[in-house]
Amino acid sequence: MNIKNFSVELEFAVNDKPAKLVLESRSAIEGYEDENLKLVCLVDDSCDTHTLRIIVTSKKPLKMKSAQIVHDHFFGKREQFFANGYQSWTTSREYKRGDTQYGLRGPSKLPFARKIAGVSGDYHFTVYGRELFHSFTYTYLRNDSKVELFGSLNERTGYTIFYADMKTNVFVITKDVEGLTIDGEYELFNTVHTIGTYDAVFDRYFEAYPLKHTGRVDHFAGYTSWYNYFQNIDEKIILRDLEGLKRAGDAANIFQIDDGYETYVGDWDLDTKKFPNGMASIVDKIHAAGYKAGLWLAPFAAEFKANIVKEHPEWLIKNEKGKNQFSGIAWNGFYALDIEQQEVRDYIKAYFDKVFDDWGFDMVKLDFLYAACINPRNGKTRGQLMCEAMDFLRECCRDKIILGCGVPLGPSFGIVDACRISCDVELSFKERYYTKVTNQEIISAKMAMNNSIFRRHLNGRIMANDPDVFFLRDDGMKPAKFTMEQKKLLAKINHMFGSVLFVSDDIGAYDDEKMQILLDSYKEFDGKVISAEYVSHDEIEIVYEKDGKRHTLKFNTLTGANSEK
């Protein structure tokens, strides 16, 4: 694609009067000025990584409605468009002509259900349609081994969303400018473009990206409590499973306590009935076993029942009607704290200080972070709100390890050390009925493996990828309904594509076979993935090299049936 062949289209209002500006590439590159604004377009195609920046300087306040760069592009029959989903959990994969990128489905499209099902995704500010695909922050077009990447270098001015309209054969780069008024100089777009092999284009993209991989986490292997007990944890369970993890020896290096230790999400008081000896004593035992200690938090969330909701309703983000912004269905519903207020920032920082200084944790898993930017507010776009929220979390966490989750990925680049790149894994390998009637963030073993494979390019370049857990147990408080073949497949995919490898099982109850699978899965993958793609509607084929030999793994995403040669 010729990056110098495009049009720039802006829609805005000046003094409440609608206006539109359309410039062909030549006019944009030469520079444009009128009574409302000055536009500068800077294009550099002198090296392998091309850059395009568009800067608008307003002469009067411009209330933005839309901003986009439009390229004509004929999409070939075999050409693949990669769609990076809105946040950690959102389905991310390649699409071609005839495919469908699903949004909300079935009953979830109804007004009341849409409010609930759609809040964690992009359904209220993006467009879904037949042979219309979109991607956040970056994307690529792939023809066999040739890959053409487009990526944003700045999400602070608004999310950059790439659309491939295969019906009309246009490729569009848009900026989510909802809520933005430009009053002065504003960088609307800052993008890169490069062509090469899959690995080469991502190497170049993250070389150009202004923030870098923190380097604090290369490989985590260990335990998290959530997927066996959910909120039903206590000191006895945690210490028993810590003892069980010791069977893994030096193969493990992290033990994480998940949701369930607190009285209410948002209050963050320790439930002393469950943990009568406090958290510091447990952290001491984790450290004595040779592991880093991790703790789950949802720092922007306040469940409906939390005391903070009753005592400080003014601390909550409000919607356009002045009501508390509904932010998700977890814990029977929760609101979001407004970190634009200094009192809220002080409150959140205080419990991070407790987690690190009083309790002694080394790592925090920070979840449901999308709640910071569901709607634009205070003249800031969603992208700006999310980037500033991530900056604040890094400030709170100092040099401690952050594992991000439920977070838009672009704003997390260079801030988090590791990040969930998939939805939660369902306790059943077979997909539940609700996966077909709700959003694209729903729990699913199938889509967790899908995302692990198709977001592999992030792993080690900008973060350590967390593909979510794998299961080996046969029983437990919440048995996993997987066959042994399905368990081994999930473990293998996580091992090949992830760098954060967790189970929630009581490892002390494993037999010798399960113990060996665990130890093999905990190791760093010492092979190289050559390619991975859907070869039919429900089959993925992975080609990789290991020990000097080329291997092909093919598996059915619905049944887990697989073969390798």
Q: Where are the model-predicted features located?
A:
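Carbohydrate-recognition beta-sandwich/jelly-roll modules
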Residues: 1-253
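Flexible loop/turn segments at secondary-structure boundaries
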Residues: 229-233, 262-265, 300-305, 371-375, ...
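Aromatic-lined carbohydrate-recognition surfaces of secreted/lumenal glycan-active proteins
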Residues: 225-227, 256, 291-304, 386-419, ...
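Aromatic-lined carbohydrate-binding/catalytic grooves of carbohydrate-active enzymes
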Residues: 219-223, 227-353, 359-378
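Carbohydrate-binding surface patches
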Residues: 488-490, 494-502, 533-565
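Short glycine/threonine-rich loop-to-helix capping motif typified by GTGT followed
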Residues: 376-383, 416-417
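Glycan-recognition surfaces
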Residues: 310-346, 394-509
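Amphipathic alpha-helical
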Residues: 518-530
